[in-house]
Amino acid sequence: MQVDTVRFGTLSVDDDKIMLFPKGLPGFEDERRFFLMDHAGNSKIKWLHSADSPELALVVADPFDLFEEYRPDVPDEIARELGITGPDGALVLTVLTVRAGQHEGEPPTISANLLAPIVISKERRTGAQVVLRSGEYGVRHQVHLRLGEGVKHTAGCGAGGMGSVGGVGSVGGVCSEETVATA
């Protein structure tokens, strides 16, 4: 299918790459169809782009690449709703917020929303943004990476314990959370 975007022009996206978010995302409840694309210049960063709204694109990353101790505990009922049957069946993303430097020449600051990861069933390609029940995480965890390069070093978030999706063990994948940069 052809998808018009403000930031990237017209893109050709295979139908099997479209992910369905039955309840949309917080703040974008009417947006249900999204796809992932790589960010040029940094393999750690991706774009979660709406298939229907040309201007809606969120900067996302794999939270496990950025925060080694991150262990989100996704409620069993949400895992069941999405069709996630095991840890290898989940893709987890964190939404990144990129803020311009305060002064000319100052690099941007980047934060990750670890409180509300985006969880996607790899098999069914259905997803949801999940607000975690524990108080361990917040919406602004500082990330140390450069937009044009790979991660320079990680920032720990002090999480303890093993995370799980549907009670099946720790989850790996791509991070998610707060809604950030729109195109």
Predicted features and spans:
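Long, compositionally biased stretches
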Residues: 1-67, 87-163, 169
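Short beta-strand-centered segments at strand-helix junctions
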Residues: 69-77
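Short active-site loop/helix that positions an aromatic residue
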Residues: 76-86
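Active-site-proximal loop/hinge segments that shape catalytic or ion-binding/gating pockets
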Residues: 171-183
